[in-house]
Amino acid sequence: NRYVEDEIWPFLYSKIVDGKSGDIVYEHLAVNKRLLPNQNIDGSTWMRIWSMSKLVTISLAMDLMEEGLFYLDDPVHKYIPEFSNLMVAVNSNGESISRSRKVDLDCPHDVVNMDSIMTIQHLFNHTAGFYYALTPSKCLNEQIDSSKLLQAENGNQLIDLLSNLPLIQHPGEAYFYGLNTSVLGLLLERVTGTSLRQIFIDRIGKPAKLKELAYTKPKGIELLPTFTGR
């Protein structure tokens, strides 16, 4: 609750439901009324889950992997050939950007060929080399911002845009949090020939009768506003 009071979080809501009986075991709500003065929040409120969607994608991937559709050590380019020749951004000393000190990050960066094969396991554990526009490198941040990834209309467009961006490191070199799970979702679409949304519906949504989680906003629903924490 202190994080909500200090405006680090605009609100906090949690609920635990008994999977068999449907009874609510635990429920708690805290709202910062300055940030959300007129907002009613309860168990029926639709909200973005942001990076918690990674749990959904990884669960779907594990389900498909158990059926033998792919394996952790499979090369990513086996399913996304557009990623066969990805380049890696390096500093003037030839070190990958993820391992560079800030003083070594003069723009523009050189790029080199990958020195290892990117596998599906690298996507799982965030060592593939994909990133968000939050890196120590101004160059990479500007490149990913200007690439307009969020404007991609489908998975194939997103793959094409990503294929033109350098990786921040060689696959498997180190942990670097980024778009790796999103790429895993694109790979699942290639493996199954259907959308990630439909994979979720078929494998989690319908079997679990889960109506409270969706990839598209239900009609007539207004989502909670977004905030930048401090």
Question: Where does each model-flagged region fall?
Answer:
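Active-site SXXK
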Residues: 1, 48-76, 181-189
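Residue-level detector of short, conserved catalytic/binding motifs and their immediate flanks
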Residues: 12, 53, 118-121
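Short, solvent-exposed loop/helix junctions and linker helices
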Residues: 5, 46-51, 114-117, 178
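Short, flexible loop/turn elements at secondary-structure junctions
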Residues: 18, 34, 51, 124-128, ...
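Short, surface-exposed loop or secondary-structure junction motifs
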Residues: 80-230
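Residues at or immediately flanking beta-strands
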Residues: 11-13, 75, 174, 214
